[in-house]
UniProtKB/Swiss-Prot annotation:
Family statement: Belongs to the bacterial ribosomal protein bL36 family.
GO BP: any one term: translation
Signal sequence, start to end: none
InterPro entries found in the cross-reference section: Ribosomal_bL36 (IPR000473), Ribosomal_bL36_sp (IPR035977)
Listed transmembrane segments: none
Disulfide bonds: none
Protein name: Large ribosomal subunit protein bL36
Amino acid sequence: MRVQASVKRLCRNCKIVRRKGVVRVICIDPRHKQRQG
């Protein structure tokens, strides 16, 4: 899980999701998981 100021899609399987006010990226590749913080 990467914590970044600006989250971006790294591939076409990445999806940007808002959960409880936190922007996250979910993907089939676990290395692409990100959270905005």
